[in-house]
C-alpha cells in the first residue's frame, strides 16, 4: 500500500505540473499575480503552479494552495485537480484523502480525466 501511495503521489505531481502554463521569468510572475488578484481563475491556477515549483518566485506550497483554492472555488477544473493533488500529497496542507477525493470528483465533473481516475481510486479505498 505504501508503495502504491508513493507511486500515485509521484504521478499526481507529474500530472499536476502539466495543468498550468509556466511563466518564463519574474516579470511574467508579476503579470500573472496582477491578473490573479483581479480574479482571473486561469491566472490563479498558473500562480499556484508557479509557487508550487518555485518558477519565477520562491517555492511556497502554502501560497500554491491558496491560489489553487481560489481558482478551484471559481470552478476551474484544472485547479480543482491541482488542489486535490495537494490534499493527496499533503504539500501545503494537512493530508486529507476525503478532501482530495472531493476535489478530484469536481475536477472529474469538469472533464479532467486524471481527476476521474484518482476519484475512483480513493472511492475504492473507502475515502
List each language-model region with its residue ranges:
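Alpha-helical tetratricopeptide repeat
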Residues: 26-29, 33, 41, 45-49, ...
